[in-house]
């Protein structure tokens, strides 16, 4: 009967002989013992409980319940076991008694034969190996076989029996064939003789049947149990349902909240939005949509690059298109959008035009002819975007009617209500607004920066029930979180050259960079500086409007890579793929820094903003850090290695763009050059020339001064003072080092110093210096972390005749800025007299910081 054990008496001689054939050799047993020795303690309690529970039940063909002896120790069992009437069994038993008891127990545990398994049992996975030294059954001749997962008539107690471990493939085992009830490797009853030689099927993956005849066998659960065929379809469907639920979980919350189906947006508008690459509403758009659509006044604040323009454009267009009346010629605008710059006004107008084909959108700003704008007003306008100056001109000339306004938007409201525009905005809005009237147009104010005074000024234009949406709130960081903020200390005389190196490393020839300057003159000069290898154009107020539009369009299209601009490009401009923003000096107000840095890192992209500063601008930089809630990472100028590496990458990219037809014309020259110089030398020279890096100046990593190399002297202990480093330098390099080192400052934790030396002195210093357990001298490849910002040079650059005042000057000037020399000193920062007793002159704090 399938699933039942036969008694040892009924096994017969054939079974015994077969068992003898399948017994493994002692060496094989020993090998298995060694492999499982480390696992002998895992299932001791479970196996003992299994033995005791199974000892209470017997096969119908085996001995009765009364004949079952209680479980005994392995030694006692071996002594009491007696051979059955089968001769083969007797000989086998006597042979096994000669083996050590431990090996006998192991063979009884692992080497078992099986009775005919059912189809379900044959399909089950192979069990794990049993622990060495633990018998899988009690008295083998008297007890039922150990089952897996309760199959083959399990009792309640048997269901809890731990699963035996897998036997090795191809190792047929048997206990005492005549005495013990044989077991399968998977815990089932013994198979027929034909089945013994059948190779075991390979392990199948979960959900796959081990047997090829799928129609006859039930599917397996993960735990190896068989299952009725009906639920099979359900189990196959489960992975699909699970994967679909996982897909839903993977959708970000922002996309779920911003799905178009959550808002009353027409299909036509959705198609136009998708054409612009907008597949869902951004957080600021989703949170303001219903306020704008329902006609409520609103003040909204969100970081740069988060999509504020569409926050008011989409709901206003849907509202106007929903109540669209007859399009009369000469109709007055219903929506007025005011922007601080011409470039921003032009961009907002384009955003409106891109998502509506039914409404008329016009843009009025200075620098363009009046005639075309007057003609647009005669034709009729639904949405008017413009700058305050030109809108005011049309009002004063009586050409523009704003009495029909229903919606007014002030983009970059903090600048629109500031002193520069406040009077013009007041004059424009007083035409459509009445004091304390509920019939005033809906007022919408948007910006990335909203100081407290903005709310006070804005209240006179807004209803008392206005809404406020602030996605920045009390968060410390006001600037874009997708932008990395870096700072480089550099004197203004070195600034242009260092900016050129920075662009090479952080943007390259293929990237786009915006450089912000404080004045129009600086912007014009920097755009024409030869240190900037990439094509550069300037954008400022003195450039004619037509040229400004051409320049901005060319930069958007990638016709040139560097745009040098004043604040006209700081606000609102959405220029794609700007990799780097450079600010030539800290701005006067933190709002300008936030808007400038926001030209990169837009719409989920990341970007870098680098701010240059001098000693006297440390205070301004700290103010930006405090108010913008950011922390600048102070870095040194790009090293020669970094510049060359970046330049070579750019040159290789340029090689990829050369067409094959052009290459064929240069093959003969290339072959000749390779013969003369060699392939590597020739190609390296070509790459250097293409990249423009034929000569790279070494620069100080402390203050960016050309012709200097920064070196680091590390100490294994904390240094009490800076003279501790000077003493070690003089001991190894001699007194002459006094004239070669300058700008020495502590490293973080005072575990060393860094200083500058002239480029030509580096090799000499490296040859003379010998590292010790306490001191190690290296050339810096990047700016080290300093104990504090260096307060200018206090070094020992002076001569013995008294010219060391500013740099350190123990004999030729003091260690402070004013160079209080004891024997004179002509090289301090403040000194006026070339010799003797130069004490410099005092300066006030405000003068020192240019305030």
UniProtKB/Swiss-Prot annotation:
Chain segments carrying region 3 X 37 AA tandem repeats: 117-227
Phosphoserine found at: 7, 13, 118, 144, 155, 181, 192, 218, 236, 243-245, 639
Reported regulation of activity: Acetylation inhibits the helicase activity.
Residue sites binding ATP per the record: 302-309
GO CC aspect terms: B-WICH complex; cytosol; mitochondrion; nucleolus; nucleoplasm; nucleus
EC number of the protein: 3.6.4.13
Helicase ATP-binding domain segment(s): 289-468
Highest taxon of the lineage: Eukaryota
Described purpose of this protein according to its UniProt entry: RNA helicase that acts as a sensor of the transcriptional status of both RNA polymerase (Pol) I and II: promotes ribosomal RNA (rRNA) processing and transcription from polymerase II (Pol II). Binds various RNAs, such as rRNAs, snoRNAs, 7SK and, at lower extent, mRNAs. In the nucleolus, localizes to rDNA locus, where it directly binds rRNAs and snoRNAs, and promotes rRNA transcription, processing and modification. Required for rRNA 2'-O-methylation, possibly by promoting the recruitment of late-acting snoRNAs SNORD56 and SNORD58 with pre-ribosomal complexes.
Protein name, entry field: Nucleolar RNA helicase 2
Source species of the chain: Mus musculus (Mouse)
């Amino acid at each position: 009967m399938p699933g039942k054990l036969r008694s040892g008496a009924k096994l017969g001689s054939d079974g015994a002989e077969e068992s003898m054939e399948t017994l493994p050799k002692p060496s094989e047993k020993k090998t298995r013992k060694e492999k499982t020795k480390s696992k002998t303690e895992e299932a001791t309690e479970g196996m003992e409980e299994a033995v005791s529970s199974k000892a209470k039940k017997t096969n119908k063909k085996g001995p009765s319940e009364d004949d079952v002896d209680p479980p005994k120790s392995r030694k006692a069992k071996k002594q009491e076991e007696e051979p059955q009437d089968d001769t083969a069994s007797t000989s086998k038993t006597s042979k096994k008694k000669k083996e050590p008891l431990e090996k006998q127990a192991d063979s009884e545990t692992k080497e078992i034969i099986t009775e005919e398994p059912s189809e379900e049992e044959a399909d089950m996975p192979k069990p794990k190996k049993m622990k060495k030294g633990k018998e899988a059954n009690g008295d083998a001749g008297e007890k039922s076989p150990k089952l897996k997962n309760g199959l083959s008539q399990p009792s309640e107690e048997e269901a809890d029996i731990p699963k035996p471990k897998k036997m090795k493939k191809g190792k047929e085992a048997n206990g005492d064939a005549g005495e013990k009830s044989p077991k399968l490797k998977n815990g089932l009853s013994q198979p027929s003789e034909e089945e013994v030689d059948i190779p075991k099927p390979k392990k199948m993956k979960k959900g796959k049947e081990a047997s090829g005849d799928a129609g006859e066998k039930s599917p397996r659960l993960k735990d190896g149990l068989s299952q009725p065929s009906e639920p099979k379809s359900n189990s196959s469907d489960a992975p699909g349902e699970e994967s679909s639920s996982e897909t839903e979980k993977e959708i970000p919350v922002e996309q779920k909240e911003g799905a178009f189906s959550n808002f009353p947006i027409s299909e036509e508008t959705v198609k136009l939005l998708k054409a612009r690459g907008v597949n869902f509403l951004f957080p600021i758009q989703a949170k303001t949509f219903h306020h704008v659509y329902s006609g409520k006044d609103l003040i909204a604040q969100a970081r740069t690059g988060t999509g504020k323009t569409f926050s008011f454009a989409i709901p206003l267009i849907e509202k106007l298109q929903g109540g669209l009346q007859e399009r009369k010629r000469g109709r007055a605008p219903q929506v007025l959008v005011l922007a601080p710059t011409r470039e921003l006004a032009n961009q907002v107008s384009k955003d409106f035009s891109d998502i509506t084909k039914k409404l008329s959108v016009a843009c009025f700003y200075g620098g363009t002819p009046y005639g075309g704008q007057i003609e647009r007003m005669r034709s009729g306008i639904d949405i008017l975007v413009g700058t305050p100056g030109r809108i005011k001109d049309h009002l004063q000339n009586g050409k523009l009617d704003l009495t029909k306004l229903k919606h007014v938007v002030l983009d970059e409201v903090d600048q629109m209500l500031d002193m520069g525009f406040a009077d013009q905005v007041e004059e424009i809005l007083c035409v459509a607004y009445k004091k304390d009237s509920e019939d005033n147009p809906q007022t919408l104010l948007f910006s990335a920066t909203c100081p407290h005074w903005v709310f006070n000024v804005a209240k006179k234009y807004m209803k008392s029930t206005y809404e406020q949406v602030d996605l920045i709130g009390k968060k410390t960081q006001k600037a874009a979180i997708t932008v990395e903020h870096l700072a480089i200390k550099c004197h203004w005389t070195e600034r242009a050259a260092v900016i050129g190196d920075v662009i090479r490393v952080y943007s390259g020839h293929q990237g786009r960079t915006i450089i912000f300057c404080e004045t129009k003159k600086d912007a014009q000069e920097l755009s024409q500086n030869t240190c900037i290898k990439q094509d550069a154009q300037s954008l400022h107020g003195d450039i004619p409007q037509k040229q400004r539009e051409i320049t901005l369009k060319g930069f958007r299209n990638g016709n040139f890579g560097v745009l040098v601009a004043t604040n006209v490009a700081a606000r609102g401009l959405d220029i794609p793929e700007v990799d780097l923003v450079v600010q030539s000096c800290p701005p006067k107000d933190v709002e300008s820094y936030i808007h400038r840095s926001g030209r990169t890192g837009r719409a989920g992209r990341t970007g870098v903003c680098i701010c240059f500063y001098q000693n006297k601008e440390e205070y301004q930089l700290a103010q930006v850090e405090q108010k913008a809630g950011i922390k600048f990472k102070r870095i040194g100028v790009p090293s020669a290695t970094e510049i060359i590496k970046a330049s070579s990458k750019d040159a290789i990219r340029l090689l990829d763009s050369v067409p094959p037809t052009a290459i064929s014309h240069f093959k003969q020259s290339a072959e000749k050059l390779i013969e003369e110089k060699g392939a590597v030398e020739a190609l390296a020279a070509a790459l250097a020339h293409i990249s423009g890096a034929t000569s790279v100046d070494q620069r100080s990593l402390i203050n960016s001064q050309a012709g200097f190399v920064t070196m680091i002297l590390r100490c294994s202990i904390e240094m009490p003072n800076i003279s501790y480093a000077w003493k070690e330098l003089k001991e190894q390099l001699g007194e002459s080092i006094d004239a070669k080192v300058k700008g020495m400052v502590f490293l973080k934790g005072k575990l060393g110093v860094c200083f500058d030396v002239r480029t030509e002195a580096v090799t000499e210093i490296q040859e003379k210096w010998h590292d010790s357990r306490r001191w190690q001298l290296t050339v810096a490849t990047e700016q080290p972390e300093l104990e504090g910002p260096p307060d200018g040079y206090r070094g020992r650059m002076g001569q013995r005749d008294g010219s060391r005042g500013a740099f350190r000057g123990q004999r030729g000037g003091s260690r402070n800025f004013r160079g209080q020399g004891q024997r004179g000193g002509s090289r301090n920062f403040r000194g006026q007299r070339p010799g003797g007793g130069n004490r410099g002159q005092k300066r006030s704090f405000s003068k020192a910081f240019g305030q």
